[in-house]
Amino acid sequence: MKQLFRQWYDLSEIKKELTTRNWFPATSGNISIKVSHEPLTFLITASGKDKTKTTPDDFLLVDHLGVPVLETELRPSAETILHTHIYNNTNAGCVLHVHTTDNNVITNLYSDAVTLQNQEIIKALDIWEEGATIHIPIIENHSHIPTLGENFRKHIQGDSGAVLIRNHGITVWGRDSFDAKKRLEAYEFLFQFHIKLLSIQGGVSNGANSYS
């Protein structure tokens, strides 16, 4: 029970911080944190909640299938399946899914992936070589959630990572809440920088074409 309370507090603090950045507009987004590994349980944001508010109903505990562990009238977020795929296939400890203007713009500029390079902040992703290059996959935003989940699952390749969904934000996961938040901040910095650079240069770089 102590672990549940500790993780609830940790997730609540992350929600507060991301809210101050306006990364949950119009109740969008969802975040989760692992509570136990065996059996797998995790806390996830309840569906349709105003994340600028803090209430006792912000999160609910679900199992490896995303089913509530305790009887509740709350519903887990619609994209809970993305979280279950991550937790069931990795040792990740936290998953963050946010909608920002920048990450949505990026998915309209590129088709299957965006390539970013030569930025010092890439080291926040545990990539240390000089002039490092990263590739972030972009998948289509299917309204059929199982199809979205299956396409998403193909890009889960470790205890940390990120996937962009076209016009539907980014999902980032990490070893724990600190790692996940650090990675999310790094990706959003890279997106913002890239878009500003393109606005100065007047075109899409990396050899990619504008996607629509």
Curated annotation (Swiss-Prot):
Residues that, per the record, bind Zn(2+): H97, H99
Keyword Zinc: yes
Record EC number: 4.2.1.109
CC annotations in GO: cytoplasm
Pfam families in alphabetical order: Aldolase_II
Key word Lipoprotein present: no
Cofactor(s) this protein cannot do without: Zn(2+)
Catalytic activity, as annotated: 5-(methylsulfanyl)-D-ribulose 1-phosphate = 5-methylsulfanyl-2,3-dioxopentyl phosphate + H2O
Keywords linked to the UniProt accession: Amino-acid biosynthesis, Lyase, Metal-binding, Methionine biosynthesis, Zinc
Pathway annotation from the record: Amino-acid biosynthesis; L-methionine biosynthesis via salvage pathway; L-methionine from S-methyl-5-thio-alpha-D-ribose 1-phosphate: step 2/6
Cofactor details (free text): Binds 1 zinc ion per subunit.
Subunit structure and binding partners: Homotetramer.
Family: Belongs to the aldolase class II family. MtnB subfamily.
Function of the molecule: Catalyzes the dehydration of methylthioribulose-1-phosphate (MTRu-1-P) into 2,3-diketo-5-methylthiopentyl-1-phosphate (DK-MTP-1-P).
Protein name per the record: Methylthioribulose-1-phosphate dehydratase
Native organism: Bacillus thuringiensis subsp. konkukian (strain 97-27)
Taxonomic lineage from the root: Bacteria, Bacillati, Bacillota, Bacilli, Bacillales
Gene that this sequence comes from: mtnB
